[in-house]
Design a protein with these regions (language model features):
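N-terminal secretory signal peptides that target proteins for export/translocation
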Residues: 1-11
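Bacterial N-terminal signal peptides
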Residues: 15-25
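Bacterial Sec-dependent signal peptides at the C-terminal "C-region" and cleavage site
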Residues: 24-32
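Flexible coil segments in periplasmic/lumen-exposed cytochrome c-class electron-transfer proteins
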Residues: 31-106, 145-264, 299-334
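Detector for the c-type heme attachment site
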Residues: 110-117, 141-142, 178-179, 268-274, ...
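Short cysteine/histidine-rich zinc-coordinating motifs and their immediately flanking basic loops
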Residues: 119-125, 277-283
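Extended intrinsically disordered, low-complexity coil regions enriched in Ser, Thr, Gly, Ala
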Residues: 126-155, 186, 283-295, 299-307
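Intrinsically disordered, low-complexity segments enriched in Gly and acidic/Ser/Thr residues
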Residues: 257, 264, 270-279, 286-292, ...
Length: 334
């Protein structure tokens, strides 16, 4: 029988998965103990503050640099409206991305932005494989993807949305965001002391009183320009402060596995960490978001089809390891 197109590629991918499963099993056997469970880091799971402590929202008709568009505060806060400041910078949005479907399918582009760049409280989904996005929606729907923090509103919203969105809407949104290349979005800076922060709108922002404090074992990710971030400007990115020396340590863990601490990320995610097949790219994405995913795999909150691979890989990682890995990944070209 003649070989069908793509059969050799599929066999190669299956063989790779088998090899990785064996490697992960070996890694798990070598682990004396898993990394001890720790309290969830609030910098990665900031949630939403009590009423009255959120950042002050925009007032009246608003604009962002370089755009002729104008939106009101009510429009900017409406989950069924996507402030499209630069409509020529991306393909035409499917209806589910631009407006959603009332009453319970929010516009995808509102939270993830029209270009899929996302924000620390949700996820950058630009450039992810279509099949991967579709699978994640199925995992949300089937209870296989949750958050280790039940108060993580972005995940709660995704779970609720997944139960109402249609298969066609999921495919349309997945195809749209997959077609857009992720752009550099995060500036990573190594520091010993970091600006003091507060929680606003599900993310960290600079504290009103200023000042600094030791960074410790944290990644502090804040908007480059809070006002533009609140206006959902898809061209205004973020700064990620990481501890001194963490990028070199992260590179070692990512590229070599750190002498048995984990496995090389490049084995599954590609030599340049920009994905391979239906395995997602992990370069240049939010370190806050990536930290949550590693912890969620560790704690069993993520249980999709390839979760067994990731669980074995992240079992021994400490919070210091995770900070180093996610900081290094964020510093790489998407």
């Amino acid at each position: 029988m003649p070989t069908m197109p793509g059969s050799s590629m599929r066999r190669g991918y299956i063989a790779l998965v088998v090899v990785l499963l064996i490697a992960v099993a070996t890694l798990a056997e070598q682990a004396d103990t898993a990394a001890p469970a720790q309290k969830l880091p609030i910098w990665a799971y900031p949630g939403f503050p009590p009423s009255g402590t959120a950042a002050s929202g925009p007032k009246g008709a608003e604009h962002v640099p370089g755009s002729t568009a104008s939106y009101t505060a009510a429009q900017i806060g409406d989950l069924f409206v996507v402030p499209d400041w630069f409509p020529k910078a991306h393909p035409p949005m499917p209806e589910v991305v631009s407006h959603g479907r009332k009453p319970d399918v929010f516009a995808c582009g509102h939270c993830h932005l029209p270009n899929g760049q996302g924000r620390p409280e949700n996820e950058s989904i630009a450039g992810l494989p279509t099949a991967y996005i579709v699978q994640q929606m199925a995992d949300f729907k089937n209870g296989l993807r949750k958050s280790s923090d039940p108060g993580m509103l972005s995940v709660t919203n995704m779970v609720l949305l997944s139960k109402s969105v249609t298969d066609d809407e999921v495919k349309a949104a997945a195809g749209y965001f997959s077609s857009i290349k992720l752009k550099p979005w995060i500036r990573v800076i190594e520091v010993e002391n970091v600006p003091r922060t507060r929680i606003a709108g599900g993310m960290l922002v600079l504290a009103d009183g200023g000042g600094t404090e030791p960074i410790g074992d944290r990644v502090i990710e804040v908007p480059e320009n809070l006002e533009r971030t609140e206006l959902r400007d898809p061209t205004s990115g973020f700064i990620a402060y990481v501890p001194k020396g963490s990028l070199e340590k992260g590179k070692l863990l990512v590229t070599t596995g750190g002498n048995g601490t984990t496995m090389q990320c490049t084995m599954c995610h590609g030599e340049n960490l920009q994905g391979m097949g239906n395995t997602p790219s992990i370069a240049g994405r939010s370190p806050s978001q990536m930290t949550r995913q590693i912890i969620d795999f560790q704690r069993g909150a993520r249980n999709g089809s390839l979760a067994p691979l990731m669980k074995g890989v992240v079992t021994k990682l400490t919070i210091e390891d995770i900070v180093a890995i996610t900081g290094y990944l964020a510093s790489q070209k998407p």
